[in-house]
Curated annotation (Swiss-Prot):
InterPro entries: Ribosome_maturation_RimP, RimP_C, RimP_C_sf, RimP_N, RimP_N_sf. Required for maturation of 30S ribosomal subunits. GO terms for biological process: ribosomal small subunit assembly; translation. Its main location: cytoplasm. It holds the Pfam family DUF150_C. It is found in: Cytoplasm. Keywords: Cytoplasm, Ribosome biogenesis. Transmembrane segments: none annotated. It comes from Natranaerobius thermophilus (strain ATCC BAA-1301 / DSM 18059 / JW/NM-WN-LF). One of its GO terms (cellular component) is cytosol. It comes from the Bacteria. PANTHER family: RIBOSOME MATURATION FACTOR RIMP (PTHR33867:SF1). This is Ribosome maturation factor RimP.
Length: 154
């Protein structure tokens, strides 16, 4: 099983539980840090995320992950807020955060570049529509996006 398949399996196990607790599952990472595996789960909801929220979700997921055992080695579970520069992963993210400043990196060059920054206009026919800071409106196919996240507005 690939790392991507493992993450997908974990998401399928935990997303219903996270949703039942009233939160959105934003992202899941399984990474090696300081010679330990870390399963990092990012959650959100409209009112922001506090320590009590993270603890509630962590306790619920701990038990659920023990039952399903999708990770064949020991790991540390961390639950946290996605932060101000949260990733945009799902179609609904590109709709919900329309009007916000974003950064998008693509797998391949589009119009001679792979990095785009600008104001997110929304989603249109499987394309993210972006008003870039320097070259006007661009449409980026969803399947070409390697990484997308909000930009911190000061």
């Amino acid at each position: 099983m690939t790392q991507h398949d493992n993450i997908s399996q974990i998401e399928n196990i935990i997303e219903p539980a996270v949703r039942d607790l009233g939160y959105d599952l934003v992202d899941v990472e399984l990474i090696m840090e300081n010679q330990k595996w870390v399963l990092r789960v990012y959650i959100d909801h409209g009112k922001g995320i506090g320590l009590d929220d993270c603890e509630l979700v962590s306790n619920s997921l701990d038990q659920l992950l023990d039952e399903h055992d999708p990770i064949p080695h020991s790991y540390v579970l961390e639950v946290s807020s996605p932060g101000a520069e949260r990733p945009l992963k799902k179609k609904k993210d590109f709709v919900n955060f329309a009007g916000k400043k974003v950064q998008i990196k693509t797998y391949v060059k589009l119009d001679g570049r792979k990095n785009f920054k600008g104001k997110l206009l929304g989603l249109e026919d499987e394309h993210v529509v972006l008003e870039t800071f320097n070259s006007g409106e661009v449409k980026i196919p969803l399947d070409k996006i390697a990484k997308a996240n909000l930009l911190l507005e000061l």
